[in-house]
Amino acid sequence: MPEPTRPLRPLLPLPDGGWQAMSVATPVDFKIRGLALVPPRSTVPVIVVPGIMGTNLRAKSKPRSREEENEEVNPGKPAWRPPNTTPGGLWDALVWDQYDPAYRQRLLDPDTLEVDDSGEPHIRHAQWGPHVHPQLARERWWGELHAGSYIDLLCMLETRLNQTFYRRYAEDMRRIRPHWQEVMDCDPAKWGFPHMAPLTEAELERHALHHYPVYGAGYHWLRSAHEASQRLEQRIDDVIDYWKAHKRKCEQVILVTHSMGGLVARACARRIPDKIAGVIHGAMPA
């Protein structure tokens, strides 16, 4: 009979290719051991590209000229960071209602702003523990994205893509996670794909051979999609290089986009198609 375990916080990658697990000291009569899930070596990063206004913006931290200095906020201070709660949104609506067009143009002057990665990720907790270590969320640029719009998606992808099977205590039997069972039970015809076969357990087994760390990729949505695509291209290169440096097999990423993020991803994919395994668009403009 398998012994009972308790889930530990998500692991932290080490430069030598290993993983670090954090636990706590317990009394000697507490016999339930901590369980850390070690990801596979093959890594396929998933990068979420938000829609227009979904990236936090701040005044440039180090303006190089007078023209790059924002007239309304100090260097490094937020210029666009929507609140993440309903009361906060109502309050912000009242505040912004007092701003006249001239003030808004000065505040949101594209030449004086940059992507702000210091937003609070607001990590959600799954039934069996946190979706991702808060330190990793910061390092993966989750703070660039508006949490109220995208944190649920980020957490869901991080958990569901990397949690495929499990073993229930007192049962020496592998089971499929409920979120994947729902996908298997779904009729593809309901989604407009009548000729597609439902997902199989064999396909899930192949899926589980890879690690899917989830990243954010904000961009300066007041500037052109071309500039945003260049930033995304650099983000893809940085992520792939990171995992290779940590002795992981990593050649391609998957992009998950929303709205204007789809246009950014398409422009990027034209230049580096070999580094993108696939793109999943959500509500992309025509």
Regions found by a protein language model. Give the residues of each.
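N-terminal non-catalytic accessory region
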Residues: 1-256, 260-286
